Protein backbone atom coordinates (compact mmCIF):
# COMPACT_ATOMS: atom_id res chain seq x y z
CA UNK A 1 0.00 0.00 0.00
CA UNK A 2 2.79 2.43 0.90
CA UNK A 3 4.73 1.83 -2.33
CA UNK A 4 1.68 2.02 -4.60
CA UNK A 5 -0.23 4.92 -2.98
CA UNK A 6 1.18 6.74 0.03
CA UNK A 7 4.76 7.08 -1.19
CA UNK A 8 3.64 9.17 -4.17
CA UNK A 9 1.38 11.35 -1.99
CA UNK A 10 4.21 11.85 0.50
CA UNK A 11 6.63 12.75 -2.32
CA UNK A 12 4.25 15.29 -3.86
CA UNK A 13 3.47 17.11 -0.61
CA UNK A 14 7.10 17.16 0.59
CA UNK A 15 8.39 18.35 -2.81
CA UNK A 16 5.86 21.19 -2.81
CA UNK A 17 6.81 22.25 0.72
CA UNK A 18 10.56 22.07 0.04
CA UNK A 19 10.26 24.03 -3.21
CA UNK A 20 8.61 26.86 -1.29
CA UNK A 21 11.13 26.71 1.57
CA UNK A 22 14.19 26.47 -0.68
CA UNK A 23 13.00 28.90 -3.37
CA UNK A 24 15.38 31.66 -2.11
CA UNK A 25 18.32 29.20 -2.20
CA UNK A 26 17.33 28.02 -5.68
CA UNK A 27 17.07 31.59 -7.00
CA UNK A 28 20.37 32.72 -5.44
CA UNK A 29 22.19 29.61 -6.70
CA UNK A 30 20.79 30.15 -10.20
CA UNK A 31 21.83 33.81 -10.16
CA UNK A 32 25.37 33.08 -8.99
CA UNK A 33 25.79 30.30 -11.57
CA UNK A 34 24.61 32.70 -14.26
CA UNK A 35 27.17 35.28 -13.15
CA UNK A 36 30.10 32.87 -12.70
CA UNK A 37 29.68 30.55 -15.69
CA UNK A 38 26.78 31.75 -17.84
CA UNK A 39 24.72 28.56 -17.99
CA UNK A 40 22.45 27.50 -15.14
CA UNK A 41 20.49 24.31 -15.83
CA UNK A 42 21.70 20.89 -16.95
CA UNK A 43 19.13 18.50 -18.44
CA UNK A 44 19.60 14.93 -19.62
CA UNK A 45 17.43 11.96 -20.54
CA UNK A 46 17.40 9.25 -17.87
CA UNK A 47 15.46 5.97 -17.50
CA UNK A 48 12.86 5.94 -14.74
CA UNK A 49 10.06 3.64 -13.60
CA UNK A 50 9.80 0.65 -15.98
CA UNK A 51 12.69 2.19 -17.98
CA UNK A 52 10.47 5.04 -19.18
CA UNK A 53 12.70 7.91 -20.31
CA UNK A 54 12.33 11.30 -18.63
CA UNK A 55 14.34 14.53 -18.53
CA UNK A 56 16.24 15.10 -15.29
CA UNK A 57 16.99 18.62 -14.03
CA UNK A 58 20.13 19.72 -12.19
CA UNK A 59 22.06 22.90 -11.62
CA UNK A 60 24.93 22.95 -14.10
CA UNK A 61 28.16 22.94 -12.09
CA UNK A 62 30.69 22.43 -14.89
CA UNK A 63 31.59 24.75 -17.75
CA UNK A 64 31.67 23.75 -21.43
CA UNK A 65 35.36 24.59 -21.87
CA UNK A 66 37.14 22.68 -24.64
CA UNK A 67 40.73 22.12 -25.73
CA UNK A 68 42.27 23.16 -29.05
CA UNK A 69 40.83 20.00 -30.68
CA UNK A 70 37.31 20.90 -29.61
CA UNK A 71 37.16 18.17 -26.96
CA UNK A 72 35.66 18.90 -23.56
CA UNK A 73 38.26 19.39 -20.85
CA UNK A 74 38.36 16.94 -17.93
CA UNK A 75 35.71 17.23 -15.23
CA UNK A 76 38.30 18.53 -12.76
CA UNK A 77 39.22 21.45 -15.03
CA UNK A 78 35.62 22.33 -15.90
CA UNK A 79 34.44 22.39 -12.29
CA UNK A 80 34.98 25.96 -11.06
CA UNK A 81 35.07 27.34 -7.52
CA UNK A 82 31.35 28.06 -7.12
CA UNK A 83 30.45 24.81 -8.86
CA UNK A 84 32.51 22.94 -6.26
CA UNK A 85 30.55 24.65 -3.48
CA UNK A 86 27.24 23.79 -5.13
CA UNK A 87 28.28 20.14 -5.45
CA UNK A 88 29.74 19.84 -1.96
CA UNK A 89 26.43 21.06 -0.50
CA UNK A 90 24.40 18.91 -2.96
CA UNK A 91 22.61 22.06 -4.12
CA UNK A 92 22.88 20.81 -7.71
CA UNK A 93 20.20 18.23 -6.84
CA UNK A 94 17.60 20.81 -5.71
CA UNK A 95 16.04 21.13 -9.18
CA UNK A 96 15.12 17.45 -8.99
CA UNK A 97 12.33 18.54 -6.65
CA UNK A 98 10.53 19.46 -9.89
CA UNK A 99 11.09 15.89 -11.14
CA UNK A 100 9.54 14.59 -7.91
CA UNK A 101 6.61 16.97 -8.25
CA UNK A 102 6.00 15.76 -11.83
CA UNK A 103 6.12 12.11 -10.77
CA UNK A 104 9.28 11.24 -12.71
CA UNK A 105 11.18 10.64 -9.48
CA UNK A 106 10.76 9.96 -5.78
CA UNK A 107 12.73 11.32 -2.85
CA UNK A 108 14.10 7.85 -2.19
CA UNK A 109 14.94 5.18 -4.77
CA UNK A 110 17.78 3.96 -6.99
CA UNK A 111 19.53 6.90 -8.63
CA UNK A 112 18.53 7.44 -12.31
CA UNK A 113 21.61 6.56 -14.36
CA UNK A 114 22.54 7.00 -18.02
CA UNK A 115 20.31 5.60 -20.76
CA UNK A 116 23.35 3.92 -22.31
CA UNK A 117 23.60 1.61 -19.28
CA UNK A 118 20.22 -0.06 -19.93
CA UNK A 119 21.50 -2.90 -22.19
CA UNK A 120 24.37 -3.59 -19.76
CA UNK A 121 22.24 -4.62 -16.78
CA UNK A 122 21.71 -8.26 -15.91
CA UNK A 123 18.26 -9.57 -14.94
CA UNK A 124 18.71 -8.84 -11.23
CA UNK A 125 20.08 -5.34 -11.81
CA UNK A 126 17.09 -4.47 -14.02
CA UNK A 127 14.89 -4.72 -10.92
CA UNK A 128 16.13 -1.25 -9.94
CA UNK A 129 13.70 0.13 -12.53
CA UNK A 130 10.66 -1.43 -10.84
CA UNK A 131 10.33 1.70 -8.66
CA UNK A 132 10.68 5.41 -9.34
CA UNK A 133 14.29 6.60 -9.21
CA UNK A 134 15.24 8.76 -6.25
CA UNK A 135 17.13 11.91 -5.36
CA UNK A 136 18.84 9.73 -2.79
CA UNK A 137 18.88 6.00 -2.14
CA UNK A 138 20.16 3.07 -0.10
CA UNK A 139 23.37 2.97 -2.17
CA UNK A 140 23.97 6.69 -1.63
CA UNK A 141 23.97 6.37 2.16
CA UNK A 142 26.12 3.23 2.04
CA UNK A 143 29.12 4.44 0.07
CA UNK A 144 27.78 6.44 -2.89
CA UNK A 145 30.67 6.89 -5.36
CA UNK A 146 33.18 5.16 -3.08
CA UNK A 147 31.79 1.67 -3.80
CA UNK A 148 31.76 -0.45 -6.96
CA UNK A 149 28.89 -0.44 -9.44
CA UNK A 150 28.10 -4.05 -8.57
CA UNK A 151 27.75 -3.13 -4.89
CA UNK A 152 25.58 -0.12 -5.76
CA UNK A 153 23.22 -2.30 -7.77
CA UNK A 154 23.03 -4.87 -4.96
CA UNK A 155 21.99 -2.08 -2.59
CA UNK A 156 19.49 -0.72 -5.14
CA UNK A 157 17.84 -4.13 -5.53
CA UNK A 158 17.78 -4.59 -1.75
CA UNK A 159 15.82 -1.33 -1.52
CA UNK A 160 13.36 -2.41 -4.22
CA UNK A 161 12.69 -5.68 -2.40
CA UNK A 162 12.41 -4.07 1.05
CA UNK A 163 10.79 -0.71 0.34
CA UNK A 164 8.92 0.76 3.30
CA UNK A 165 8.09 4.10 4.92
CA UNK A 166 10.53 3.45 7.77
CA UNK A 167 13.35 2.58 5.36
CA UNK A 168 12.66 5.77 3.40
CA UNK A 169 12.79 7.84 6.60
CA UNK A 170 16.06 6.17 7.58
CA UNK A 171 17.60 6.91 4.17
CA UNK A 172 16.48 10.55 4.24
CA UNK A 173 17.90 10.99 7.75
CA UNK A 174 21.24 9.43 6.77
CA UNK A 175 21.30 11.55 3.60
CA UNK A 176 20.86 14.74 5.65
CA UNK A 177 23.78 13.70 7.86
CA UNK A 178 26.00 13.02 4.84
CA UNK A 179 25.14 16.39 3.27
CA UNK A 180 26.01 18.16 6.53
CA UNK A 181 29.30 16.24 6.71
CA UNK A 182 29.85 16.66 2.93
CA UNK A 183 30.89 13.02 2.71
CA UNK A 184 30.82 10.45 -0.09
CA UNK A 185 30.54 12.88 -3.00
CA UNK A 186 33.17 11.18 -5.14
CA UNK A 187 36.10 8.82 -5.06
CA UNK A 188 39.33 10.38 -3.90
CA UNK A 189 40.90 12.41 -6.69
CA UNK A 190 37.84 12.28 -8.96
CA UNK A 191 34.96 14.68 -9.54
CA UNK A 192 32.70 11.99 -10.97
CA UNK A 193 32.82 8.21 -10.76
CA UNK A 194 33.92 6.01 -13.66
CA UNK A 195 31.26 4.89 -16.13
CA UNK A 196 29.55 1.52 -15.79
CA UNK A 197 30.70 -0.97 -18.44
CA UNK A 198 28.73 -4.05 -17.44
CA UNK A 199 31.66 -5.61 -15.59
CA UNK A 200 32.72 -3.10 -12.95
Curated annotation (Swiss-Prot):
It is found in: Membrane. It catalyses: tri-trans,hepta-cis-undecaprenyl phosphate + UDP-N,N'-diacetylbacillosamine = N,N'-diacetyl-alpha-D-bacillosaminyl-tri-trans,hepta-cis-undecaprenyl diphosphate + UMP. The keyword Nucleus does not apply. InterPro entries: Bact_transf. The chain crosses the membrane at residues 12-32. Pathway: Protein modification; protein glycosylation. Its EC number is 2.7.8.36. One of its GO terms (molecular function) is phosphotransferase activity, for other substituted phosphate groups. GO terms for biological process: protein N-linked glycosylation via asparagine. GO terms for cellular component: membrane. Keywords: Glycosyltransferase, Membrane, Transferase, Transmembrane, Transmembrane helix. Its main location: membrane. It comes from the Bacteria. It is a single-pass membrane protein. Belongs to the bacterial sugar transferase family. Glycosyl-1-phosphate transferase that mediates the first step in the biosynthesis of the undecaprenyl-linked heptasaccharide donor in the N-linked protein glycosylation pathway. Catalyzes the linking of uridine 5'-diphosphobacillosamine (UDP-Bac) to undecaprenyl phosphate to create the first membrane-associated intermediate undecaprenylpyrophosphate-linked Bac (Und-PP-Bac). N-linked protein glycosylation in C.jejuni consists in the transfer of a heptasaccharide (GalNAc-alpha1,4-GalNAc-alpha1,4-(Glcbeta1,3)-GalNAc-alpha1,4-GalNAc-alpha1,4-GalNAc-alpha1,3-bacillosamine) from a membrane-anchored undecaprenylpyrophosphate (Und-PP)-linked donor to the Asn side chain of proteins at the Asn-X-Ser/Thr motif. This is Undecaprenyl phosphate N,N'-diacetylbacillosamine 1-phosphate transferase. It comes from Campylobacter jejuni subsp. jejuni serotype O:2 (strain ATCC 700819 / NCTC 11168). The lineage of its organism: Bacteria, Pseudomonadati, Campylobacterota, Epsilonproteobacteria, Campylobacterales. The gene is pglC.
